[in-house]
Each structure stands twice: as structure tokens, then as C-alpha cells.
Amino acid sequence: MAEAAGEAGASERDPDAVRARRRLRVLSGHLLGRPQEAPSTNECKARRAASAAGASPAASPAAPESGTIPKKRQELMKWNGWGYNDSKFLLNKKGQVELTGKRYPLSGLALPTLKDWIQNTLGVNLEHKTTSKPSINPSEAPPSIVNEDFLQELKEAHISYSQDADDRVFRAHGHCLHEIFLLREGMFERIPDIVVWPTCHDDVVKIVNLACKYNLCIIPIGGGTSVSYGLMCPADETRTIISLDTSQMNRILWVDENNLTAHVEAGITGQDLERQLKESGYCTGHEPDSLEFSIVGGWISTRASGMKKNVYGNIEDLVVHMKMVTPRGVIEKSSQGPRMSTGPDIHHFIMGSEGTLGVITEATIKIRPTPEYQKYGSVAFPNFEQGVACLREIAKQRCAPASIRLMDNQQFQFGHALKPQVSSIFTSFLDGFKKFYITKFKGFDPNQISVATLLFEGDREKVLQHEKQVYDIAAKFGGLAAGEDNGQRGYLLTYVIAYMRDLGLEYYVVGESFETSAPWDRVIDLCRNVKERIRRECKERGVQFAPLSTCRVTQTYDAGACIYFYFAFNYRGISDPLTVFEQTEAAARDEILANGGSLSHHHGVGKLRKQWLKESISDVGFGMLKSVKDYVDPSNIFGNRNLL
């Protein structure tokens, strides 16, 4: 981010720099209006030369890297857990849970009630800790199988690569529980043989052509945040497996302020994209929970959804144009028109393809001016059912905020346990008064309360009008305004919740989240039945302590909603916790489908859920997908075996 940081510094010193930069980007948008004209072949060569300058192609680049994700990811991110190396939940010297580092609003703050919540909810004994491997042992990694002719041509193309064990292991997995558990205690049976780092579209074309020439297997990787086994290497793959890492394709190529679009390389992370657009006064508004690490190409290939989709749309609503390199050649449309009637939409063959057809290299996406005003809120309901009814009415009246999330009671209790220590006596008094007012004066049962968090953004006057409309609807369903602070805190927790699983693993707790979508008339029954199924399955499989089984409604639509489930259990006394966990999760998925839910709302299918795909889309639909795969990639070069 050296270039972006330099631009930001210049803008602070000279306001004219902002205007000048914006004018240049507008001009670039007109001059480079067609994606195929940017970047130029010479630019591609220059980036490759810089990447390999002064060293062999296998070495780290001499030039500064511009994106958040470096080539050596392990220098910044955990190799066997979620997120940044400097951020983790632990027990501090006072015996309180604390998040280390300085990256998040919660960092460095004590969470005085979380320890008791963990002990009481999951039966955890904090005197008993698990052990995990401190680092990757290169001797434990499967040996690299490399085609020497391919390697020689890769060197001649000056495309950076690595055969180091730590680089290969880091790209052998996503973030499913099974994958992280294996990293802590064992090793994968099969990992990539080589990691390659293209720096532009032309590099990807060269790599794919070489893979076709020598019949090699390619598994693309972006942010590495997959939760569907999407990155796991097939154990019986005998060909050289190439991990094609797009993280160095991380530029905004142009911004067109007339058409409100931006053309970007597909390896740019969400946080880099939003930060750079913000410098020019724009945003995409696409904010998945994995925003820090996930990339544009990954969003497209999994049909991602962001928490503010009510205003900005899901990824399929944001993409105007895209370019994909396949074994048959490059797929892209000839026009960037906003809508076309040219048969089935080619974009929808690419969206959701999960790395099985090719590599997405560039995309044109819609942008919007950065909202001038943002306001948080929260509403407490007597129970979950009343909350769901309220969200249904808000959706019916087409007045949903940018984001609205409804937590069931157990999720509400968990969120309350994540509340930082209060330093102000007055604030503590106010919190106590609010609790008294809701539970005693209004008669809410603390064990039934359900809470919705709200995020409004846009023009200030319209936001305030919108806010009043939503709270008026909530009141009709027994909802009470629960404060802006509670709403804001709920959203600030978004990017730290994933760190909680690593803490659990240290104390014999396995946990996971999964999602679905369902029609409104199925939401309540589905939530109840799935949570009950999880509890029943755990009991039948010998789990000694009642599991955490909870849910929340995270997104709303005219015809239904997205529902997230969270479950975890204490596995002390269980000889094979992974099998118990996976059988329970599979049973929960069966229950979801039996209750009218979808196979996935936005996580995708991967290898984890593909056993249910044919049932979900019909034999004919499955055959259609297979026919596309067979034509586009007849030799199965993109052989991650997701979906089919």
C-alpha cells in the first residue's frame, strides 16, 4: 500500500491533489473504457520484472507490494488460525479474556464476563488446555511433485513462484473447522506442489496455457477465506498442483465517475478496494464479514453477499463486466451495458463457479458516492418470533436499513458477554437502568429477549426519516429502542468474532457457523428445528455438555431471509471430535433442506456441501453445470473438484 499511503499523505498536505487525482481517474476511465486495454502488455512486463528483480523468480519480490496480502502470508497472518498474527483472544494476567493487538476497536480491552459465559455455557475447565504445533515442520509436508519443463517455462516468463513448504501449506486450506484442526494437530494428505504469483491478466493467460500444455492442475486462491473445503487439494490428484495466488493482482485500474464504475484486478481485497475508493469519495458498499481478506474474484466465484446489500445489492447486482481465463480461452462480453437480452447471462456461468472453470482476472463493478451520514441503532423484542415478524413487515414495506440483523436469545447473551469493561460509573448505571426498564418495567423475560441491530446510511435527512419509519414498525411488534451504542457495538464485533474459534480450540471446544436462506413462512420453524436437531445429535453422539446452538437472521428479502447458525461443543472425553462434529453439521444441513432452506445463501458449495447439490438443483440442472465444465475445461485443468 506504499503508493496508496503516499497518495493519502499528499492529499492531506494539498487538497488540490485530491481533485487532480480524481480528474486523472476520470480521464483513465474514458481512455481505458474497454477492460482489455488495461493494463498494457508493457505494464505487465514491468510488474513481472519488478517482482523478480535482483533474485530468482522463486524469491520474494524486491519491489514493495501494494496490497494488504503479502506473498509470504505467514509473516502477517496465522498459519493455523484466523486473521492477523498480532490479534488473538487470550486470558490476561487478571484471568479476563482480552483481544491482543491494536487493529480493532475491541483490541486491548478486557471482557470481564466472557470467561464465565464460556465456562457456564460450554462446561469448559480453563485449567485444561490443548496443545498445537508451534510452526510448520517442512519435513511433515508432502513432497513437491513438479513438472520440470513447466518450471523452466515459468522461469522464462519471469513469473514469481515458490516451492517452499510453508507457502504450499498456507494455500492448502480455507477456514473450515476440519482444516484448522488438522493444521493444529496433523498435516494434509495433499497440498499444492508450487505456488505462483501472477501480477496481471497476461500472466494468468501464460500460466493457464502452460498448465494445459503439460496437463497440470490449477487451484486458484484469493483471500483464502473459503469455508466449504474449496481450497483443499484432492488427495488422489497425481498431477502437479499449482496454487495460483491472485493476491498480487491488486490494483484499481480505472474509475469512471460518469458511469459510476471502477475496473479492478480481481485479487484486490475488500479492505484495500474500499480504502482506495474512499480517497476519491466512493465505495462499493459490499461488506462481507471476510472483508479484510477476501477478494473481488472470490466474491464473484462464490456469489458473495455483504451485510449492506439492502442498499448496494449482492455481488451479482454490483458486477457490470468481468474477465475470466479458461482452458478454452478468455470469456468476457463485448459491451459494458447495464443489462442485455442475449440469451442466458454468461456472467452467471462464472458467478458461483468456485474455481472450477478458470481464473477471474478483472472486473468492472458499480460504485457509489461515500454516504454522508451513518447511524446505528438497536431494538429489543420480547422474543425471537416477534422479531422475525417485525423484519418481515419491514421487508414488506421496502424500508429495510442498509443492514438489519436479528439475534436469538442465546446469541444476544453471547453478545452481551463480549461487552468490554465499563470504566465509567455513570455508564454502568445507565446500562443497569436500561436492563431494569426492559425486564422489570416492560416485563421482558431475559431468557427470551431477542435483539435486532440496525445500520442506516445515506443522506442525513432521509436516514432520520427512515429510522423513524423502522422504529414505528418495531413498536407494533413490541419492540423497544435499545440504543445506538448497542447497535454500533454489534457491528464492531463483526470482524473479531472469527477469532473466537481459535480461543475455543485451546480449551477443547470445536465450533463453526453455517448459513442458509428460506422463505419467510419457513424461517421460525427452520430455526427452531435446526437448533433442536443439533442438540439432539450431539447428545446421541456422546457430547457430555449441552452444545451452543444459536442463530440469527442476517439479511432480508421480499420473499425470505438469510439465517446464520452457530454451534459449538466441549469435546473433552470424545475420542474423535472431528467425526462427531462433521456428522452433526451434516445432520443440521439435512434438517435445513427438510425445512425448506437452501443449500447455501453465500458461502458456496465447495466439496463440503456438494453431496446435496444434485438434490438442490435437480438432475437436469446438475447435468447442465457438468456440460459447461466438460466444454470449458475438458481436461479438468481446474481440478479442485468443487461443486460437481
Curated annotation (Swiss-Prot):
Pathway: Glycerolipid metabolism; ether lipid biosynthesis. Residues 10-19 have a biased composition (Basic and acidic residues). The modification N6-acetyllysine is found at residues 88, 333. GO terms for molecular function: alkylglycerone-phosphate synthase activity; FAD binding. Its cofactor is FAD. Keywords: Acetylation, FAD, Flavoprotein, Lipid biosynthesis, Lipid metabolism, Membrane, Peroxisome, Phosphoprotein, Transferase, Transit peptide. This is Alkyldihydroxyacetonephosphate synthase, peroxisomal. Inhibited by divalent cation Mg(2+). Substrate binds at residue 501. The gene is Agps. The record marks 405 as: Important for enzyme activity. It is found in: Peroxisome membrane; Peroxisome. InterPro entries: Alkyl-DHAP_Synthase (IPR025650), FAD-bd_oxidored_4_C (IPR004113), FAD-bd_PCMH (IPR016166), FAD-bd_PCMH-like_sf (IPR036318), FAD-bd_PCMH_sub1 (IPR016167), FAD-bd_PCMH_sub2 (IPR016169), FAD-linked_Oxase-like_C (IPR016164), Oxid_FAD_bind_N (IPR006094). Residues 49-64 have a biased composition (Low complexity). It comes from Rattus norvegicus. FAD binds at residues 220-226, 289-295, 302-305, 354-360. The active site is at residue 564. Its EC number is 2.5.1.26. Residues 601-603, 640-644 are annotated as: Important for enzyme activity. It catalyses: a long chain fatty alcohol + a 1-acylglycerone 3-phosphate = a 1-O-alkylglycerone 3-phosphate + a long-chain fatty acid + H(+); hexadecan-1-ol + 1-hexadecanoylglycerone 3-phosphate = 1-O-hexadecylglycerone 3-phosphate + hexadecanoate + H(+); 1-hexadecanoylglycerone 3-phosphate + a long-chain fatty acid = a 1-acylglycerone 3-phosphate + hexadecanoate.
